[in-house]
Each structure stands twice: as structure tokens, then as C-alpha cells.
Amino acid sequence: MPRKAREFIDRPEALYHIVCRGNNKKRIFRRSEDYRRLLNIIRLSKKEFPFYFYSYNFLPNHFHLLVETREFSLSKFMGRVNFLYATYFNHRHNRSGHVFQDRFFSNIIDKEKYFWAVGCYIDLNAVRAGLVQNPKDYFWSSFSIYCQKIYGGDLIDRDKFLSYIGINDLEQARLDYIKFVEGKLCSEDAKTPVFIKSTKMI
């Protein structure tokens, strides 16, 4: 049965928290090459759909993204990413059918109030899932880039993300963000953050 069409509002220069889940909560990543393939698809898609890419976290059965649009269609971008990855995943693992549950979910985030809060929430996903005790130890997350454990290259717009703290010293901002995230490890906000309660799912 075809999926029902859903309403979606594209807003230029908006900050989106995006979530894509595996169909029936099944795994969408089985091997390291699967994670790398999705990252590469996103990297290549930035050339066609210019946007700011701030955070990601890839869990076994879903993934999170934090992006800021720049005069482009978010729905077209996500449609391309999910189509290319689903095509790869089905071929690579000799399967057919839907890879993702629905298409994607997104929240428009208030940049003035919750910019770092949503980044922190995304970076702590692997901790909440019980995969690691500290987010810096999870390889498939942008937090490892902010901690300089891996090289992000042209994938993450790190400096623009860090500039939102409002200080000119980006290295100090990076250290402040790491401290901010690690300070939320035992916080209730990390489980059900205020931005989730205050923004609209579309």
C-alpha cells in the first residue's frame, strides 16, 4: 500500500532537527561501511543542496541530523538522501522493501533559545541508547569531530555552529561546547529536552 502524502512546510534559513527511523524499528546500519556511505551521501548532497550541517548521530536503527537551510527544499534534500541510501542498503544486503519508517520527521528549532541544546541532545543519543558512557567515545557522531577525535573535513560546518555562542575565540567555544554536553550527561533535559516540548513536529 502506498504511503499517504503528508504536509510539509519548507522554510529558508530555518534550523531543523531531523530524525529518520528504520522501518518497524529495524536496523538501517549493519556494518561500518553503511555508516560511511550515508555520510558520503550527505557530503555529496551538500554540493547540490547547499546547507549548513552542524550535528549528526547515527544509531543502529535511526539517525539524527541538525541542519540549517539556505534557500533550498529540505524535503527534496531528504528525499534524495533517503532514496540513495535505501537503494544502496537494499542492494548491499540483498533485500527489498522499505528501509525507513515513513519519510522523515523534523522540528523547526528556535535558534536563539535552543541552538546548542538540540546539538547536545543529538550528541547524547548514543549515551541514552546505552552504546557508550561518554559521547566522545561514539565514533558515528559529530561530537567526535568537535572533540577532534576524528577529522570532519568539509562535512560539518563546525565554526559556524560554534559561533552561535557569541564569542570570537572559536577554540574556547569548542571547549565550552564539550563542557556543556558532558555537563548534561545526568540531566533530565538530555532525556526529554525543552526544545522537543516547545517546537512543532512537521
For the regions a language model picked out, list residue spans one by one.
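Short Pro-Cys-Gly-centered "Cys-loop" motif that presents a nucleophilic cysteine in a tight turn
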Residues: 1-55, 59, 68-202
